[in-house]
Amino acid sequence: MQEILLKSKIHMAKVTDKSINYMGSIGIDVELLEKSNIKPYELVLVADVNNGQRFVTYTIPEEKGSRKIVVNGAAARLVEQGDRVIIMAFGMYENDEYKGPRVLIMNEDNEVVEIREGT
């Protein structure tokens, strides 16, 4: 039986900007997308640690090395610049094929300080 399980997580990233008039999405530095195994345009759940808001959107790539996390569209009303967020992507797995998620632990400057596999 297939189950929906956590595939990837970017933990405690800092929102660097927001744009209410953009057509939706969350922009993420392409380097972070690659390291986290989250694809451009993939569906993600975002949790704002500062205010408890959660929303579903999709990713778009930001410039590699920019460390940008940009919330766009209506969801931009749910965050503030400087908020810390958890970005989660899920996948469908058979129990015997699931090895656990890849988790990027971020610092205040949106630098990866640790990568955890299968935890």
Curated annotation (Swiss-Prot):
Catalytic activity, reaction form: L-aspartate + H(+) = beta-alanine + CO2
Residues the record marks as active site: S25, Y58
Name of the protein in its database record: Aspartate 1-decarboxylase
Record-level Gene Ontology MF annotations: aspartate 1-decarboxylase activity
Record InterPro entries: Asp_de-COase-like_dom_sf (IPR009010), Asp_decarbox (IPR003190)
Protein keywords: Autocatalytic cleavage, Cytoplasm, Decarboxylase, Lyase, Pantothenate biosynthesis, Pyruvate, Schiff base, Zymogen
Upper taxonomic lineage: Bacteria, Thermotogati, Thermotogota, Thermotogae, Thermotogales
Assigned protein family: Belongs to the PanD family.
Any GO CC annotation of this UniProt entry: cytosol
Modified residue annotations for Pyruvic acid (Ser): S25
Catalytic class of the enzyme: lyase
